[in-house]
Amino acid sequence: MDTNTESKSRLKTFLDNPSKALWSLAIPIMFGMGIQTLYNLVDMIFIGRLGGNAITGIAFNMPLFFLVLGLTMGLGTGVTASIARFIGQDNKKEADNSAEHAVFMAVIISLSLSSIGLMFGKTILALFGAEGEILSLGWEYLHVMCVGMPFMIFSGFFRSILAGEGDMKFPMMVAGLGTVLNIILDPIFIFELESYGGFGLGLGVAGAAMATVISQVIVFSVFVYMLFVKQHSYITFRLKDFSFSMDIIWDIVKVGLPASLSMVVMAIGQGVFNKILIHFSADTVAAYQIAGRIDMLVFLPIFSVAASLTTLVGMFFGAKEYDSLRFTIRYGIMSAFFITVLSSTFIYFFADLAVGLFTDDELIISIAVTFLRLFAFVYPLISIGITTGRVLQGLGKGLPVLIITIVPVLGVSAPLAVFFIFYMGKSVEWVWYSMMVSTIVAFTIALTWLVSTIRTLPTVKLETNQ
C-alpha cells in the first residue's frame, strides 16, 4: 500500500467509527502514560526514603521541568495538529515537511534550554526560595538532568510527529521501555543496597537524575533508529527534500506557542506557590509535591483522551467532515468528564492510603490529604478544561489555551493566595481554596470559547470542486 492510500485508509477508518477511533488512539497513550506515571510515583517513593528535604529539593525543580515539558508538549501539539490537518487534506509532502521543521525546532530548543539550565539553574532555584540543604539537593538533581535534556526534548517531538499521523502505539511502547528501565535503574543509582550485597551506587537524588538520563538516551536512540534508519512511519524524513518555510513554522507556532506559554505560566505559578508554601514549612512543599504526583494519576486517562482529540479533530477539520467533528468533540469531552467523576470519588475516600505510599510523616500526610479531598470536587471541571483546550488546538486555535491558563493562574489563584496568606494571615487551606476558584474560572472560559467556536462551523461537509 503506498503512503497516500495508507493516509486515506486511516482517515476513512476514523470517520467510519469516530468513538472507536478515539479509544484506539487513547488506549495506547493511556498505557504509555500509565507506565510513565507509575515511574513518577515509584521515583517519588524512592526519593521519599531519602527524607523530606530530598522531596522538597526535587519539588523546587518541578517548575523548571514543567517549563521544559511545556515548550516540548506545547510546540509538539502544534506539530501534531499541523501534520494531522495536512494528512486530512491528503497532502503528504507538506506533512513530511512539517515533521522536518519539528526536528529543526527540537535542535534549537534543546540546546538553548540545556545551556541555560547548566549556567543559571542554581540561581533560578534560589530565586524560587530554595536555600541551604534543599538548594544543594535541588542543584544535584538539576545539573544532571540538564545534560540529558536534549534527549528528552527530541523524544517528545518524535512522539508528536507520530501522533499527527495517528500512530499512538509505537511511541508509547518506546516510552514504556524507557520507563521500565528507569524504574530498574533508580534503586541501583539512588541507594547503596547493602542488603543486596552493596552493589548500589548510593548517589541519592543525583542518582535518580542519572537513571532518568540513561533511560532517555535509550528512548532517543530507539526513535532515531526506527524513524530514520528503518523508516517505520508514514512520515518520511529526507534532508534533501527539506524546504524551510515560515508558513509551516507559523502553522506550528500559532497553535503550539500559546500552549507552550500556557505551560510556562503554569510553571511560574508553581514556582510562586512553592514560594508561598515554604512560608509555612518544607513539609508543606513536600505535601504539595506528593499531591501533585497523585494528580497525575487522576488525569492520566484525561490527557490520553485529550491527545487523541487533537489528532482526530485536526484530521476531521482538514477533511471538512464537520458532523463527525462535532460528534467526536462531544463524545470525547463527556467521556473525560465521567471518567474523572469516578476517579474523584475514589481519591476522596482513599486519599490517606494514596499519600501513605510516599511518606510516613503524619504532618505531610495530613496536608496532602486535605488538598486531594478538596480538589476531588473540581477535578471533573479540570478535565473539561483540558479536553476543550486540545480540541481548540486541533482546530488550529492556540490562543484560547493561553488565555484559559493566564487568567486563572496569574489573575486569580496566585493573587488570591498571596492576599489570603500574607495580608489576611490565613492557613494553608486558603491556598487550596484560591486554586479551586481559579479552576472554576478556567472551566467557564474554556467552555464558553468552545461553544462559540463550534457554532461558527458549517453544519455539513463543504463540497469541493473535483
Question: Where in this protein do the model-derived segments appear?
Answer:
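Short alpha-helical transmembrane segments in multi-pass integral membrane proteins
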Residues: M1-A26, I83-P150, G198-L257, V313-V378, ...
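Signature of the first transmembrane helix
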Residues: K20-T80, A84, L257-L277
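Transmembrane helical elements of multi-pass membrane transporters/channels
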Residues: S24-N40, V144, S155, G178, ...
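Small-residue-rich hydrophobic transmembrane alpha-helices
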Residues: I55-S115, M152-P171, Y288-A351, I382-I404
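Hydrophobic transmembrane alpha-helices of multi-pass small-molecule transporters
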Residues: L67-G70, N182-D186, F220-V224, L297-L300, ...
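Small-residue hotspots at the loop-to-helix junctions and early N-terminal turns
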Residues: G52-P63, G138, L142, A282-L297, ...
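Helix-terminus/linker motif at the lipid-water interface of multi-pass membrane proteins
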Residues: G34, L38-T56, L125-G132, I188-L203, ...
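Short runs within selected transmembrane alpha-helices of multi-pass transporters and secretion channels
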Residues: G76, M145-A163, P171-T179, A208-S221, ...
